[in-house]
Swiss-Prot record:
It is found in: Cell membrane. Residues 158-182 form a propeptide. Glycans are attached at residues 65, 129, 148. This is Early nodulin-like protein 10. The lineage of its organism: Eukaryota, Viridiplantae, Streptophyta, Embryophyta, Tracheophyta. Its main location: membrane. It comes from the Eukaryota. Gene3D superfamilies: Cupredoxins - blue copper proteins. Disulfide bonds join 79-113. Residues 1-20 form the signal peptide. The keyword Metal-binding does not apply. It comes from Arabidopsis thaliana.
């Protein structure tokens, strides 16, 4: 029984620590269509959204009159549907973003891309979301004669914590009661 509980805890921990998210394209259903105005396009939405390796894009659309094509940058710019990397027409398309860099998607229906039904997504590299802190400028310190050299000062950037470490700490804290049951 305790080994089963331990396996369950490990699976739960793995699930909590995984970073991939499922992101609904446009933030809601039926956004995969030619925009009604140039004020709010899918590219404006994607520019406000941070995408990481392991995230999945989910399109919900009417499969009877639309589709999703993953294309190269030049095909995206020209709205060229002739040689897609991949094509989807299921109405519930889910694509995992497995690498950093740009991804390009256009509608597979005649004239839709030309009317703005297209999406460019940029996936951040794994190192991009880490905080970069420059080293502080050197400071000349004059020590008083009574200064105790055995006391160590805290590092200048001690208040900075990697966000991933914080998530890991909370996940472990949540799992601690389960571990006590084993």
């Amino acid at each position: 029984m305790s080994s089963v509980m331990m396996c369950c805890c490990l699976l739960l921990l793995f699930g909590l620590l995984s970073e991939g998210r499922e992101i609904l394209v446009g933030g809601k259903s039926n956004t995969w269509k030619a925009p009604e105005s140039r004020d709010e396009t899918l590219n404006q939405w994607s520019g406000r959204t941070r995408f990481k390796i392991g995230d999945s894009l989910l399109w919900k659309y009417n499969a009877e009159n639309d589709s999703v094509l993953q294309v190269r940058q030049t095909d995206y710019e020209r709205c060229d549907r002739s040689e897609p990397i991949r094509g989807y027409k299921d109405g519930h398309t889910n694509i995992e973003l497995k690498r950093s860099g740009p991804f390009y998607f256009i509608s597979g229906e005649e004239g839709h891309c030309q009317r703005g039904e297209k999406l460019r997504v940029v996936v951040l590299s794994p190192n991009h979301n880490r905080s970069v802190v420059d080293a502080p400028a050197p400071v000349n310190i004059v020590l008083s004669p009574n200064y105790n050299r055995s006391v160590a000062a805290a590092p200048l950037n001690a208040h900075i914590m990697n966000k991933g470490s914080l998530n890991t700490a909370w996940s472990l804290l949540l799992l601690l009661p389960l571990g006590l049951l084993v």
